[in-house]
């Protein structure tokens, strides 16, 4: 009986290096949960306070899965962003958040936002873009690259489409960063070393 326990212990010890090499955060470090919490809260605040020049507009709820909503990243149950998933292996969740940030970074840099002269780079959308970039860079340290799904570049939009597209993008970004902020708040409270 003692021999089988020793064999099991040796097998576990042999497996440890292999599991740690699959992490998205480099070996020997953990995500900067507190910094991620701060950046994600700032991003969340900016997403909710980004004012576009046309004032407040209520968008009707859309039914179905059209082309603009099918590509939008969502943090889902299988992404490991729940408390147990974060405790076991936070990398799946952090990679999903990173993918979403890349997606929204491309949208905020597209002609949907840059094609409007009244949206200055130092305005609220520019600040939102810079904050999003800061959080994305925190999740992907220099010299460390995650395999990401190919994020399609947005196709050029017509001027008449941009107002509605901006509103839809900001609405989905608000939902995405709200979940990401909760993930980082939980990580900062329970997983920081």
UniProtKB/Swiss-Prot annotation:
<keyword id="KW-0391">Immunity</keyword>
<dbReference type="InterPro" id="IPR010831">
    <property type="entry name" value="IL-23_alpha"/>
</dbReference>
<keyword id="KW-0395">Inflammatory response</keyword>
<keyword id="KW-0399">Innate immunity</keyword>
<dbReference type="GO" id="GO:0006954">
    <property type="term" value="P:inflammatory response"/>
</dbReference>
<dbReference type="GO" id="GO:0045519">
    <property type="term" value="F:interleukin-23 receptor binding"/>
</dbReference>
<dbReference type="GO" id="GO:0043382">
    <property type="term" value="P:positive regulation of memory T cell differentiation"/>
</dbReference>
<dbReference type="GO" id="GO:0005125">
    <property type="term" value="F:cytokine activity"/>
</dbReference>
<keyword id="KW-1015">Disulfide bond</keyword>
<keyword id="KW-0202">Cytokine</keyword>
<dbReference type="GO" id="GO:0032735">
    <property type="term" value="P:positive regulation of interleukin-12 production"/>
</dbReference>
<dbReference type="GO" id="GO:0032725">
    <property type="term" value="P:positive regulation of granulocyte macrophage colony-stimulating factor production"/>
</dbReference>
<feature type="signal peptide">
    <location>
        <begin position="1"/>
        <end position="22"/>
    </location>
</feature>
<dbReference type="GO" id="GO:0032693">
    <property type="term" value="P:negative regulation of interleukin-10 production"/>
</dbReference>
<dbReference type="GO" id="GO:0002230">
    <property type="term" value="P:positive regulation of defense response to virus by host"/>
</dbReference>
<dbReference type="GO" id="GO:0045672">
    <property type="term" value="P:positive regulation of osteoclast differentiation"/>
</dbReference>
<protein>
    <recommendedName>
        <fullName>Interleukin-23 subunit alpha</fullName>
    </recommendedName>
</protein>
<dbReference type="GO" id="GO:0090023">
    <property type="term" value="P:positive regulation of neutrophil chemotaxis"/>
</dbReference>
<keyword id="KW-0797">Tissue remodeling</keyword>
<dbReference type="GO" id="GO:0001916">
    <property type="term" value="P:positive regulation of T cell mediated cytotoxicity"/>
</dbReference>
<dbReference type="GO" id="GO:0032733">
    <property type="term" value="P:positive regulation of interleukin-10 production"/>
</dbReference>
<dbReference type="GO" id="GO:2000330">
    <property type="term" value="P:positive regulation of T-helper 17 cell lineage commitment"/>
</dbReference>
<comment type="function">
    <text>Associates with IL12B to form the pro-inflammatory cytokine IL-23 that plays different roles in innate and adaptive immunity. Released by antigen-presenting cells such as dendritic cells or macrophages, binds to a heterodimeric receptor complex composed of IL12RB1 and IL23R to activate JAK2 and TYK2 which then phosphorylate the receptor to form a docking site leading to the phosphorylation of STAT3 and STAT4. This process leads to activation of several pathways including p38 MAPK or NF-kappa-B and promotes the production of pro-inflammatory cytokines such as interleukin-17A/IL17A.</text>
</comment>
<dbReference type="GO" id="GO:0045087">
    <property type="term" value="P:innate immune response"/>
</dbReference>
<dbReference type="Pfam" id="PF16649">
    <property type="entry name" value="IL23"/>
</dbReference>
<comment type="similarity">
    <text>Belongs to the IL-6 superfamily.</text>
</comment>
<dbReference type="GO" id="GO:0042102">
    <property type="term" value="P:positive regulation of T cell proliferation"/>
</dbReference>
<dbReference type="GO" id="GO:0032729">
    <property type="term" value="P:positive regulation of type II interferon production"/>
</dbReference>
<dbReference type="GO" id="GO:0032760">
    <property type="term" value="P:positive regulation of tumor necrosis factor production"/>
</dbReference>
<dbReference type="GO" id="GO:0070743">
    <property type="term" value="C:interleukin-23 complex"/>
</dbReference>
<keyword id="KW-0732">Signal</keyword>
<dbReference type="GO" id="GO:0042098">
    <property type="term" value="P:T cell proliferation"/>
</dbReference>
<dbReference type="GO" id="GO:0002827">
    <property type="term" value="P:positive regulation of T-helper 1 type immune response"/>
</dbReference>
<dbReference type="GO" id="GO:0032819">
    <property type="term" value="P:positive regulation of natural killer cell proliferation"/>
</dbReference>
<dbReference type="GO" id="GO:0051142">
    <property type="term" value="P:positive regulation of NK T cell proliferation"/>
</dbReference>
<dbReference type="GO" id="GO:0007259">
    <property type="term" value="P:cell surface receptor signaling pathway via JAK-STAT"/>
</dbReference>
<dbReference type="InterPro" id="IPR009079">
    <property type="entry name" value="4_helix_cytokine-like_core"/>
</dbReference>
<dbReference type="GO" id="GO:0045944">
    <property type="term" value="P:positive regulation of transcription by RNA polymerase II"/>
</dbReference>
<keyword id="KW-0051">Antiviral defense</keyword>
<dbReference type="GO" id="GO:0051607">
    <property type="term" value="P:defense response to virus"/>
</dbReference>
<dbReference type="GO" id="GO:0050829">
    <property type="term" value="P:defense response to Gram-negative bacterium"/>
</dbReference>
<dbReference type="GO" id="GO:0048771">
    <property type="term" value="P:tissue remodeling"/>
</dbReference>
């Amino acid at each position: 009986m003692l021999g089988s326990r020793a064999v099991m212990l040796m097998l576990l010890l042999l497996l440890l290096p292999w599991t740690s090499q699959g992490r998205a955060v480099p070996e020997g470090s953990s995500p900067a949960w507190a910094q991620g919490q701060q950046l994600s809260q700032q991003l969340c605040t900016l997403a909710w306070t980004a004012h576009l020049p046309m004032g407040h507009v209520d968008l009707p709820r859309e039914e179905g899965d059209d082309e603009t909503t099918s590509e939008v990243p969502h943090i889902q149950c299988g992404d490991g962003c729940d408390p147990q998933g974060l405790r076991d292996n936070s990398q799946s969740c952090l990679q999903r958040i990173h993918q979403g940030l890349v997606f929204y970074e491309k949208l905020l840099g597209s002609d949907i936002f840059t094609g409007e002269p009244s949206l200055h780079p130092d305005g609220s959308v520019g600040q939102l873009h810079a904050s999003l970039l800061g959080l994305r860079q925190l999740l992907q340290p220099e010299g460390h690259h995650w395999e990401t799904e190919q994020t399609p570049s947005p196709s050029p939009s017509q001027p008449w489409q941009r107002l509605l597209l901006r509103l839809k993008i900001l609405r989905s970004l608000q939902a995405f960063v709200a979940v990401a902020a909760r993930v980082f708040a939980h990580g900062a409270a329970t997983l920081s070393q």
